[in-house]
């Protein structure tokens, strides 16, 4: 799999980026050690592995907005990641991007059986949806 060349200028600013991220979210919600980031070097599609620039695990919508706004202003890429179970490669980390881990946002907000529609936060897994609807004869 051919991935884009990382922006070395962003990588060189990594320490300062992580310091600022720790001002936007609780300090323990920023992961920047190589060892700790190994858990985030792939999604369910593990054929491609890459450590991200940093991992941010926000706890509130306001924290997400603050991180997104600041990264946009600084020209820093963000890779959003739900539960990390995707097999499509849609949440593959990049060396010059902040991985925004949204696994804490794991609530099913609405199930509309008539319209066959579920509204869920990004950390909800397919299995969680299946378990929520299976008693009513549905499967996802």
Predicted regions and their residues:
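Short hydrophobic/aromatic-rich motifs at helix boundaries and adjacent loops
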Residues: 38-40, 100-103
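N-terminal accessory segments
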Residues: 1-44, 73-76
């Amino acid at each position: 799999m051919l991935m884009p060349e990382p922006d070395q200028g962003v990588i060189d600013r990594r320490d300062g980026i992580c310091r600022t991220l720790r001002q936007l979210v609780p300090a323990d919600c920023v992961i920047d050690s190589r060892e700790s980031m190994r858990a985030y070097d792939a999604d369910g599609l593990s054929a491609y592995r890459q450590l991200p620039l940093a991992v941010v695990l926000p706890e509130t919508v306001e924290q997400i907005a603050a991180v997104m706004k600041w990264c946009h202003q600084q020209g820093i890429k963000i890779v959003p990641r739900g539960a990390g179970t995707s097999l499509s490669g849609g949440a593959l980390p990049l060396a010059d991007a902040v991985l925004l881990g949204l696994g804490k946002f794991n609530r099913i907000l609405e199930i509309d059986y008539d319209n066959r529609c579920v509204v869920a936060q990004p950390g909800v897994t397919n299995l969680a949806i299946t378990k929520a609807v299976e008693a009513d004869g549905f499967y996802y």
